[in-house]
């Protein structure tokens, strides 16, 4: 019975940490860049887009493909950085959880 109570307390603490981690994910911003910083995309670690910056020198109506490619590259860079931030935040949140050997969190 004592083990069950300890497990319940551990589960409650984990739930609180996960709630806090979700808030941190929503607040953490990452910036992806392309074209030597001429295009920047800012996302939250949850993947929500915050802003896009495009240098005016890239706004050529005759060559929209260049801007399109740079936007995709900057977005991909921001997503990669967001995924890294997400892993770090979630790893911190799960830090106190004692899982059986070989078992991992589902993220």
Curated annotation (Swiss-Prot):
Keywords: Cytoplasm, DNA-binding. The keyword DNA repair does not apply. It comes from the Bacteria. The keyword DNA-binding applies. It is found in: Cytoplasm, Nucleoid. Pfam families: YbaB_DNA_bd. SUPFAM superfamilies: YbaB-like (SSF82607). One of its GO terms (cellular component) is cytosol. Its main location: cytoplasm. InterPro entries: YbaB-like_sf, YbaB/EbfC. GO terms for molecular function: DNA binding. Binds to DNA and alters its conformation. May be involved in regulation of gene expression, nucleoid organization and DNA protection. Homodimer. Belongs to the YbaB/EbfC family. This is Nucleoid-associated protein Mmar10_0436. It comes from Maricaulis maris (strain MCS10) (Caulobacter maris).
